Amino acid sequence: MRTLIVAFIYIYCFLISATGVKAQSIQHISGKIVNHNNEPMMGNISLLSVRDSTLIKQHDFLDGIFQFSNINQNEVLVKLTSVEFADTFHHITYDGKENINLGTIRVNANNNQLNEVVIKNQTSLLKYKPNGSIEVNVANTLLSTSSSVNELLGKVPNVIVSEGQISVLGKGEAIIYLNGILISSERFAAIPVSQIAKIEVISNPSAKYDAEGKAVINIITKKNMESGIKGTASQQITVSEFGGSSTNTLLDFNYNKNKWSFIGNYGLQLGKNRELLYTTRTRPDPTEYMKSELSTDWRRKFNNYSNFGFGLQYTFSESNYVSLEYSGNIEDLGGVVESRNSIFTTNNDIFYATDVAKNDVRLNQFINLNYNVANSTNGSSLFIGLQYSNYNSKVKDLINENGLVDALNSERFLKNNADYTINIVNTQADYTKKISDNSKLEVGTKFSSAAIKTSSAFLISDDNNTEFEFNDELSSDFKYDEQIGAAYLNYGSSLMDKFNFSVGVRGEWTNYELSTTANGSQQFKKNYANVFPNLLLNMPISDAFKLHASYVSRITRPRYQGLNPYVIYQDPFTTIEGNPNLKPEKIHAFEVGALYEKFDFKLGYTYKIDPISGAALRGNNPNSYILRGINMDKEYSYFASISRSFATKWWSSTNTVSMNYSKLVDNTYSFALGTTKPQIYLYSNNTFTIPKFFKILLLAWYLGDKSYGLGDDNKRSTVLLGIERSFLDNALKLNFTANDIFKGFNRSGNYEVGQTEIYYHRTYTTNYFKLIATYSFGNSKKTDYKKKELEQTENSRVR
């Protein structure tokens, strides 16, 4: 890694010295395009010859910022064009400065009224940013046909979705933002895909972003620029040989009139889903030999999986508004969990069949109040937000357990009655001040309070018709109170137009109290403070060649349910329990990269302290095992990647090749040490457009074998084929998708801990066929609705 950094610095210094010999002419022009409300514009910028108006250089800008290098002209004419504003010209003459910053250019609105603008061009899927982030277009691509945001993220390059966790390759688990504000997993699941414009994958987040998580995925919704009514209705049917069939009905709409805006959405999922886990546990030592073959089959039935929301906003002016939003989701889960465990020891042959009739109901609700004010004159803005989140869950599972021990049959019945409530209050304020045309200061503060209460009662009977008796060993109560205060400062500027920098620091103070009756009465109380510095450098060598380097520090706190020792019962020898002794995971990440033409190169190193992992550990009984989260000692990770995108009139393609190397270290749980080897990641997303007929999507990715020192993860892959056609002047779209065609997506691997060899293989409902019909309706004309979600770090830990 040291050699790579030295090489990076050497190349940069060489190129800077090479460009420094040019003088006596304009070399570099930069600036930012905004309207009179200080909002960044998008369009095209051209450098023209003053003598004959011939084109010298040209490129598009999407976020208002533009820059040209290696101009070598004494005078040029700058032309700005866009459908958003009137054509604008600037005449620039060399006056002794070869690097010219035009500052902020305010453009006038385009008074030409266009009834319809039809753009017939292949939409590029990916945009690489100079700071190492990537921007993925969703609107008007076949990615917008995804049933859920979770499914959508599984199609994004370098993003891995598995077992409810969303990770960025080379970084780790990511936190999810909506329009720049952190949201919970439940709120994330309720976002209609039809409202998403694009997705940002931010691998090097600044101090403005919460310190939780190792990367940030920012979901950006469409800006509704039209008044009246506008919406979409979608019906989806999914059929899987493995998991069964399901339906998903989605409706979202918005209504705008004058200064009032109203939005709403509703989604309902019905049907079935399946997940199968096969696990073997072997103790080869003859003195305590044991082999367990366990299969757990989750056959889920969605009685009522629905999400809903509505929001109201009053706009004082284009950048000043107040908004109120209510959203929620219901998860009424039925079905059965079938567990079969065969245990062989030197003394006994044991078999247990356990069937859990699921009756779980969750109701999650969120209220969000926001106020935003911006002053275009001095370049300042202030956001104040308040959010209340409430999570309620009730479990009434009936467990039928049959045992066969040395040819002796046994049967018993268990009732698992549990309920938990979580209440979270968040307040935050963010202030941004423009210091100069090249400098910006961001400061903010946040306070949150979380209260979690769980009660679990296990009742046992030998006969389903007789009275059940309370079981102290499996039952428990859990209470957790937490307060987190945070403040941040981030300053961004540029030096001599040679490079841009952003430096920031975030401080967070945490105080919590935990009490549980599991394994006897236990109480924990602690407070701690952390400081998270970060630095980002962007170095434009030319229009086509840009370098970046970054350092960020992060933290990953345990999820609330990961701390709760509440028992999820599978059989007498297998339970899933939380660990109240889990510690936060600290992360230090370094990255260097280059953007050349359409190629994106990255090299990175991440060091983790107390990384949070999981394992099956031996329980109190000789043959019992508990699946729980644990802290390892440290982890070292290296990664390298190269990406390339291109687009023609009929073909758009994004391709990525990455390599990741990790080594996990443990000095506590007696993991067996093994080899380490890198993991290969391949990704290709291709859209083919047959004009006037249909679009075809071919997506494939491959994640190779991985050995990280304490275990091995086996390879997995997926291939997706989709076809879409539009009818009724694009108002109706039909899409057919075949997902995971070759059934390559599963999660399997092995590790050894506490003299026990463990192998696991998990299969999901990813091999399916899906038919989607989407109809767009409305009579909209012109307005602007801005919605913002309050930052809620603590909500991201509610899973």
Map each language-model feature to its residues.
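Face-selective signature of the C-terminal outer-membrane beta-barrel domain
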Residues: 307-331, 358-515, 540-544, 599-601, ...
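Outer-membrane beta-barrel signature, preferentially recognizing the C-terminal barrel domain
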Residues: 476-482, 555-609, 625-638, 764-767
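Short, acidic, small-residue-rich periplasmic hinge/interaction motif at the N-terminus
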Residues: 46-48, 81-85, 99-142, 162-163, ...
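Transmembrane beta-barrel wall of Gram-negative outer-membrane proteins
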Residues: 243-276, 288-337, 362-367, 373, ...
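Surface-exposed extracellular loop regions of Gram-negative outer-membrane beta-barrel proteins
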Residues: 221-237, 276, 280-283, 294, ...
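Short acidic/polar hinge/loop motifs at secondary-structure boundaries
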Residues: 155, 181-207
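N-terminal periplasmic accessory domains that precede
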Residues: 103-106, 149-152, 186, 212-235, ...
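Outer membrane beta-barrel strand-and-loop segments of large Gram-negative receptors
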Residues: 424-426, 471-476, 583, 589, ...
